[in-house]
Amino acid sequence: MNPGDMVLVTGGAGYVGSHLVRMLLAKGYRVRVLDCFLYGDMGLKECYSNPRLEVVRGDICNIRDLIRCMRGVSAVIALAALVGDAACELDQEETLAINVESTKLLSQVVRLAPEVKRVVFASSCSVFGANVGLVLNEGSVLNPVSFYARSRIVSEGILNSELEDCSVVTLRLGTVFGTSPRMRLDLMVNTMTARALSGGKVTVMGGEAWRPHVHVQDVARAFLTAAEAPSEEVSGEIFNVGGNSQNHTVGETADIVAAALPDLGIAVEHVAAVDDLRSYKVSFDKIEYVLKFKPKYSVQRGVEQLRGLLSGGALEVDDPVYSNLIYLRQYGFGGKRVDLEGENEGRKEIAESA
């Protein structure tokens, strides 16, 4: 992939995508974004005047939209998905269509577009699920505990089995945090910081579970790195995205948030654990060794950025748009579900991967 090439970013107006689109444009790429703007278009508004950006309001579940967007494309970065365990449980039919059936459509369309040489797919470290006492690498046994995680596993398999003649790279993202043009306040570090600033304390439920944190700008940079890497280094490969030093328990994360706001005297309150089996401590040796990728942003630095944004009054923190779960509960899915052939088969694949 070279500057001047056309890159298709599905979900390019989202939390990660709005950073990635800016990075691609800054490096001289032409960028086509396919997004349904379920949460609005605030993530891209500042970029609309860039002549190398083309924005298509469309649906990854619509094969016509995918075919139209694939023309002249050298690489696809597939970010569009319904994200989050709780959000995906609201309607498993919607989740199946958006997260799995759309992946099947994408693979079909890419097979018809020989000029597409690279597909980079956004998966999640949540596929590791409940794995206590282990440091998990890309070859570790998966133990998903949510429909969202199972949908990611099935989609990984679809792309790698259906696109044998295309260079497919899978990125399993850690627990993302940090500021973004399309802001989210429903992610662990972001939520803790917002509550600390508004209420003077962080409440920790349990606290022993592990999470691998990674800043949203580092995630966007990882996608750019994977898209540009030589095929012999990345084709067919899976990379966990994050840094070893940013594996923290939930309790440690709360302490870091409080320590990053020293003048506010933030209290950390521990209460009984909730019914959440997820715990995964992840190795990021592979991405550092193969792609020379290391995160630039610590959790503390991310909290400081969040404070600057939230204290400035630029956001109404109670606006549902900053929480995928609350927004979808209030406004629904915007009629995105489609009745696609193979839906029952896809649901069976998800169930069997549990």
Describe the predicted segments one by one.
Residues G200, V204-E208, P212-A354:
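C-terminal substrate-binding subdomain of Rossmann-fold SDR/epimerase-dehydratase oxidoreductases
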Residues I60-I98:
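NAD(P)H-binding glycine-rich loop region in Rossmannoid oxidoreductase-like domains
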